[in-house]
Amino acid sequence: NISQFGWVNALLILGVLISLIVPLAYVLRGKTEDHSAGRQQAETLLQILNRARQHSGYLYLTAGFFVCGFHVMFVMAHLPTFLKSHDMPPWLFGTAISLIGITNLIGTFTFGYLGDKYSKKYLLSTLYFLRSIVISIFLIFPVSVTSVLVFCFLIGFLWLATVPLTNALVGQLFGLKYLATLAGIVFCSHQLGSFASILLG
């Protein structure tokens, strides 16, 4: 850990581990079958980017992921300070973030599974709607240890469950050939939302 090795050595170790992704990706590569239309298969990157720019569904996904990033980082960055301002016990700060992380795993797998069974766009819409309800209720009612734990459990369940649904929808709209590029642009919007939440918070 950082306290044992120092931050410089910790970053070097992290860099070495991340660099292993390149040879592993080469070994694990395979031909991906793309069942999208033949017209999509023949499109160049510039053509697909131009089509994505004009596609309302893709623009909605990008805007939604901006809001997702805003939600996620706003809670992560400002929840401890919010709890402190309400005189919550110090142990609750770390417990709250940990609970979000644990339930995030459950929620992501759950919505990923449901995305194979039901309409992804309706699941994603429901997820964003539930987030707004959970956050609103938490802010309306008095803050207590119980309300914080319930909030963290629920918001954690909805935390990054948007990711498998959003990426799958991008793949459905444009095929798999340029999925990494198009999903990366959507994710960039997520990061901009995260930045905005820190800046405005």
Regions found by a protein language model. Give the residues of each.
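Helix-loop-helix hairpin linking two adjacent transmembrane segments in secondary transporters
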Residues: 1-33
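Interfacial helix-cap and linker-helix signal at transmembrane-aqueous boundaries
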Residues: 1-5, 83-84, 114-115, 200-201
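Flexible cytoplasmic inter-helical loops of multi-pass small-molecule transporters
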Residues: 29-47
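Extracytoplasmic gate region of multi-pass secondary transporters
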Residues: 53-113, 163, 197
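Transmembrane alpha-helical cores of Major Facilitator Superfamily
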Residues: 66, 98-102, 129, 184-192
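Juxtamembrane helix-start elements in MFS-like secondary transporters
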Residues: 88-97, 144, 148, 179, ...
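C-terminal transmembrane helical hairpin of 12-TM major facilitator-type secondary transporters
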Residues: 100-104, 108-169
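A late C-terminal transmembrane helix in Major Facilitator Superfamily
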Residues: 160, 173-201
